[in-house]
């Protein structure tokens, strides 16, 4: 069986800056895969390249058996792959109600039964129908991120790209959103690719991970190896030290 997502020798260049350098990863169906590294390491750029939001200068992306080159993505792709961004307020139109925000992807993809789907999506992320006609500024940060997750889920994708989905939230809310995401992944049998600078989060959420530095993958390991401190690169050890609250098993 082919991987749910496979990236082969992917490169992204902005002007003369190499944001990604021949990056390769393979994520299996139903797996939660982590990308970690310091700011500017290329982890978010990799997600954006997969989503068609960054210019690809070399390499290829495979979704199941479909090969993607360049940055153009089809409706079929966005039905299968959705992205949740770091800043929930910035990713939600401030002048649209939650109802409108959730209706838009359904309209784009020609999906019927919008009322039922919107109600079900809000219920799945722990928000009731009472939130349906509110605006983003009327919600807390955690509630806005739940709406962003509902918007991604409403078209029933098989892969979620999660770009630091809890880093903009208060610590007390982070655990709630992470537990929600994990429950959704198990219930829907989704594939996750999660970017985080917090190794504790990745150990909790992901089975395997790739460590990135200066646009390249420098180490690959399982979450068990990371938790046990069985790492090979000094850079990875420094990331462990920098992750406050990270405790080895």
Task: Please tell me what each predicted stretch does.
Residues 51:
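Helix-to-loop junction immediately C-terminal to a conserved catalytic motif
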Residues 228-249:
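C-terminal boundary and immediately downstream tail of ABC-type ATPase nucleotide-binding domains
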Residues 67-82, 96, 100, 108, ...:
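ABC ATPase NBD coupling module
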Residues 135-139, 143:
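Conserved ABC ATPase signature
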Residues 115-130, 241:
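Conserved ABC ATPase "signature" region
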């Amino acid at each position: 069986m082919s991987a749910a997502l496979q990236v082969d020798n992917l490169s992204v260049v902005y002007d003369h800056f190499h944001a990604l350098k021949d990056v390769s990863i393979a994520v299996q169906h139903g797996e939660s895969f982590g990308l970690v590294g310091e700011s500017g390491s290329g982890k978010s750029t990799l997600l954006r390249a997969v989503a068609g939001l960054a210019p690809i200068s070399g390499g290829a992306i495979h979704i199941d058996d479909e090969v993607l080159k360049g940055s153009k993505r089809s409706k079929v792709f966005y039905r299968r792959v959705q992205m949740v961004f770091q800043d929930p307020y910035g990713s939600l139109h401030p002048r649209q109600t939650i109802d409108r925000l959730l209706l838009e992807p359904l309209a784009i993809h020609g999906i019927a039964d919008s009322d039922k789907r919107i109600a079900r999506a809000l219920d799945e992320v722990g928000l009731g129908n009472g939130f349906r006609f509110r605006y983003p500024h009327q919600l807390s940060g955690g509630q806005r991120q739940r709406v962003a997750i509902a918007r991604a889920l409403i078209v029933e994708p098989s892969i979620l790209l999660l770009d630091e989905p809890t880093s903009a939230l208060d610590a007390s809310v982070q655990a709630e959103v992470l537990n929600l995401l994990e429950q959704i992944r198990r219930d829907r049998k989704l594939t996750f690719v999660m970017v985080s600078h917090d190794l504790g989060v990745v150990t909790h959420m992901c089975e395997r991970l790739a460590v990135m530095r200066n646009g390249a993958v420098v180490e690959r390991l399982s979450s068990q190896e990371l938790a046990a401190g069985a790492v090979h690169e000094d850079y990875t050890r420094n990331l462990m030290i920098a992750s406050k609250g990270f405790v080895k098993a």
